[in-house]
Curated annotation (Swiss-Prot):
PANTHER family for this protein: ATP-DEPENDENT CLP PROTEASE ATP-BINDING SUBUNIT CLPX-LIKE, MITOCHONDRIAL, ATP-DEPENDENT CLP PROTEASE ATP-BINDING SUBUNIT CLPX-LIKE, MITOCHONDRIAL-RELATED
InterPro entries xref list: AAA+_ATPase, ATP-dep_Clp_protease_ClpX, ATPase_AAA_core, Clp_ATPase_C, Clp_protease_ATP-bd_su_ClpX, ClpX_bact, P-loop_NTPase, Znf_CppX_C4
Binding-site list for ATP: 140-147
Entry keyword Metal-binding: yes
Binding-site residues, Zn(2+): 10, 13, 32, 35
GO molecular function terms attached to this record: ATP binding; ATP hydrolysis activity; ATP-dependent protein folding chaperone; protein dimerization activity; unfolded protein binding; zinc ion binding
Name of the protein described by the UniProt record: ATP-dependent Clp protease ATP-binding subunit ClpX
Family: Belongs to the ClpX chaperone family.
HAMAP family hit by this protein: ClpX
Assembly behavior: Component of the ClpX-ClpP complex. Forms a hexameric ring that, in the presence of ATP, binds to fourteen ClpP subunits assembled into a disk-like structure with a central cavity, resembling the structure of eukaryotic proteasomes.
Entry function: ATP-dependent specificity component of the Clp protease. It directs the protease to specific substrates. Can perform chaperone functions in the absence of ClpP.
């Protein structure tokens, strides 16, 4: 046996114990002092480097900071003007629009007051501190919750980020930390912390983090009540440490500090079953409202009426913890969309679906028209699917597939007229065989 077989060696560089000053033993492995020193140098270099190859905020071109697109306090629209803008893009939901318009206007008045106080322009009488009021939107899927929040962000020209509450977990478990919500907002603001701190965050599917029962469980609910607890300080206002690369935080990485005190949080969720909780509190039986022969429209109307009588206690009964409910004082209920509203969504808004497809076909020099009974048939099918306005695009996309596939290669089709029969068949292939030349009356 070689004399070197009895010598211990570094598991990393292979040097023997005689070749180094110190050899540190671990469970089945060894590391020498030279490798330890090399590891320290590598770590020091990485920690000295900036978290990402991004220039300082002052040196980066930023259209918001340039003042070209940044909303000044004097330019903030009044509540009536905000609602008018919302009406251009969102059909119905007038009560929710009013609630949002007033809440957003008051939020930015609060920011203006803070700015005035910092500049020393306020009088002693103006030293009253205005508290933040976050918003909770409750309504069925496809009723316009996310669209309302997105439209608000466009009106006010502030950073806007959307987060999904179902991906969040309590710290220490597999999933996303709640701080990753702030990272999305920071990225939208081009890493401008000051700009991000006056932005809007919409947290969707917030009802999915409700605890499973009202009674405290001995098992840990890491994606339910645990997430609600983690969100408390962020909603109220705190200095949060955000990892610039995302993922989990660890002690050796540099974090960006963001003050959430002035960030407006809008939470949204379907809260399926909340109407039953309210009905139970009111002491009324559903049978008293809905007769066996009533259709889905009657049931939706009753559910919408119950949601308008919602109280914070009902949300606690549903599974939201009292501390969380207390930090979202503004509640707005959205009504289910009926057939009439779905027809309006198809044709009236500035970005209406019919207008979008008309523009797409116009690029191929084809005039697209929908007969009124075809629009009605699309709305009826979307209503049956019970996914609100989201169903409309799927139906129209399926309907227009054949035409949109062939039209770019066809020169003989100059006009397409969509009829109810085509909607029921889910195909417009016959237009390619017999290009439509019907009169255009009753078309959308």
């Amino acid at each position: 046996m070689s004399k070197y077989d009895s010598h211990l060696k570094c598991s990393f560089c292979g040097k023997s114990q005689e070749q180094v000053r110190k050899l540190i033993a671990g469970p089945g492995v060894y590391i020498c002092d030279e490798c330890v020193e090399l590891c320290n140098e590598i770590l020091d270099e990485e920690l000295m480097e900036p978290p990402s190859p991004v220039a300082p905020v002052e040196e980066r071109p930023n259209k918001r900071r340039s003042g070209q697109n940044k909303t000044t306090w004097e330019q903030i629209p009044k509540p009536r003007e905000i609602k008018k803008h919302l009406d251009d893009y969102v059909i119905g939901q007038n009560e929710a629009k009013k609630v949002l318009s007033v809440a957003v206007y008051n939020h930015y008045k609060r920011l203006k007051d803070i700015q005035t106080q910092k500049a020393g322009g306020g009088s002693p009488e103006d030293s009253i501190e205005l508290q933040k009021s976050n918003i909770l939107l409750i309504g069925p899927t496809g009723s316009g919750k996310t669209l309302l929040a997105q439209t608000l962000a466009k009106i006010l020209d502030v950073p806007f980020a959307v987060a999904d509450a179902t991906t969040l977990t309590e710290a220490g478990y597999v999933g996303e930390d709640v701080e990753n919500i702030l990272l999305r907002l920071l990225q939208v603001a081009d890493l401008d912390v000051e700009e991000a701190q006056r932005g809007i965050i919409y947290i969707d599917e917030i009802d999915k983090i409700a605890r499973k029962s009202e009674n405290t469980s001995i098992t840990r609910d890491v994606s339910g009540e645990g997430v609600q607890q983690a969100l408390l300080k962020m909603l109220e206002g705190t200095i949060a440490n955000v990892p610039p690369q995302g993922g989990r935080k660890h002690p050796y990485q540099d974090c960006i500090q963001i003050d959430t005190s002035n960030i407006l949080f809008i939470c949204g969720g379907a809260f399926v079953g909340l109407d039953k909780v309210i009905d139970q509190r009111l002491g009324k039986k559903s049978m008293g409202f809905i007769q066996p022969g009533d259709g889905q429209a009657s049931k939706d109307k009753v559910a919408a009426g119950l949601l308008k009588q919602m109280t914070p206690d009902d949300l606690v009964k549903f599974g939201m913890i009292p501390e969380f409910v207390g930090r979202i004082p503004i509640l707005a209920a959205l009504s289910p969309l009926d057939e009439e509203a779905l027809i309006a969504i198809l044709t009236q808004p500035r970005n209406a679906l019919v207008k979008q497809y008309q523009k797409l076909l116009k690029m191929d020099n084809v005039q697209l028209e929908f007969k009124s009974d075809a629009v009605l048939a699309i709305a009826q099918e979307a209503y049956r699917r019970k996914t609100g306005a989201r169903a409309l695009r799927g139906i129209v996309e399926e309907l227009m597939l054949d035409v949109m596939y062939e039209l770019p290669s066809r020169k003989d089709v100059k006009r397409c007229l969509i009829t109810r029969e085509m909607v029921e068949k889910r195909s417009t292939a016959e237009l390619l065989v017999h290009p439509s030349s019907l009169p255009s009356q009753e078309s959308a």
